[in-house]
């Protein structure tokens, strides 16, 4: 290009290109027609997902926090976090909000994304047909650990969902006397955990996730870790090392105390 279009005799006028009307019309009109045909079903689908669902739809309040998702089932009296349980084949209306900054709720395999906006509620209606696990990710940059703000959508058969819901409605069971979990309960009660977390019947903190049935969840730490004793111990010891910016402070607990606390939290099923 440098050689071909180098400066030459200024008296010689180069060939003038006036354009090609047929070509220009073609590359303008053909995409316009295609986009028009795509727009009709797309807009219709958008309005369908925002419409009021049938009366037997399950309501779930989805609340974004830095950097985890809270799920409330107001008609069932259930509050949980990280794992969103849904019954297969039943319409679900997600009412999405935020307590701090703008987030965006998204499960790619189940539907479109919706912003979670402080002081506002957005909605999306979906029906998950196939039982399974579907990963979700916050789709709006929301701070230091935006990439670590995940969750798991667990789609269950109606019978399995009903069984899960029945357990979730109950308060936490007291661990047997003399068990490692009982020792962990004492650690929980005397640590900073009670100031931020709720375990129904034990503590009523409202800053962090509800832990009443933590042991039954598949994920912890805002969806980034599988719920295993090893991962839970890592999280309890120093959450900011796992998720930068986490509000949960480093716990000044001995190894035996961590082991006991993990045993208690894992027993909350």
Task: Annotate each language-model stretch with its function.
Residues 264:
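Active-site segment flanking the S-adenosylmethionine/decSAM binding pocket
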Residues 1-194, 199-206, 223-237, 242-244, ...:
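Non-transmembrane, membrane-proximal soluble domains of secreted or membrane proteins
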Residues 217-220:
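Alpha-solenoid helical repeat scaffolds
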Residues 268-269:
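Short, solvent-exposed mixed-charge patches
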